[in-house]
């Protein structure tokens, strides 16, 4: 379709259809994190937020404007593990939210099925299966192709194929991906360049979010206690993760937000405060 420049100049532009703030329908986005950080839990809870038209289903606080059908293709975990996650999340949902999510969310385990989106037959089945979806989650990217992850040419082809799915379904495609060993070692997993493999994976995506573990320094600077402001500390920092956006093409980048890991691994938003030293009660500035 050729853009009508006269209409574009003279008429009000269309309202962009965001899946959640900054993530545009019909585009490809990424969520990156080290292994065992909580990205699959965050993505599953986000999928439920988009699938549920009731406010009670938005556990991660995305505040989506529109909701709809969501397809979650889980390539890393067996069915039993997925059931445990759903059960843990369900404890924080009311009955109405659970019923709407059951109607609109399809959670499909694909571990061991050797799905390959670069195979034309597999690709056609994916498009047919996801035809009326608003969001498609691919967990994780490495489970759905056989290309060279370090080749910019191969990864550009892969993202282009995901864009083909997005174009044919109208859905946003969110793929989950791991970060490189170097970025994890240097605590730089919140950077746009942190993703493992070729730069085209993120350069060609239109949105990229991250989930990062709380660092030791952050645990000394932050408190989850509004009154005495005692630091979270190294012993408890494993219960907190930070979500943020490292790339956003269509809107202003939002502020990072913190989540606390609850029973079963569920992530729930938490408000953190600047910690104070117990001895002098002065505010620590180490996180600035």
Task: Describe the predicted segments one by one.
Residues 50-53, 89-92, 140, 144-147, ...:
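Conserved, well-folded catalytic cores of nucleic-acid-processing
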Residues 248-288:
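Conserved alpha/beta core segments of nucleic-acid transaction machinery
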Residues 15, 65-153, 157, 164:
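Conserved inter-motif catalytic segment of the P-loop NTP-binding fold
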Residues 1-19:
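N-terminal pre-Walker A segment at the start of P-loop NTPase domains
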Residues 30-32, 36, 41, 155-265:
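Phosphate-binding/switch region of NTP-binding enzymes
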Residues 26, 68, 131-132, 169, ...:
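Structured loop/turn residues at beta-strand edges in well-structured enzyme cores
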Residues 19-96:
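Walker A/P-loop NTP-binding active-site region of P-loop NTPases
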Residues 10-15, 117, 189-192:
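Short gly/ser/thr-rich secondary-structure transition/capping motifs
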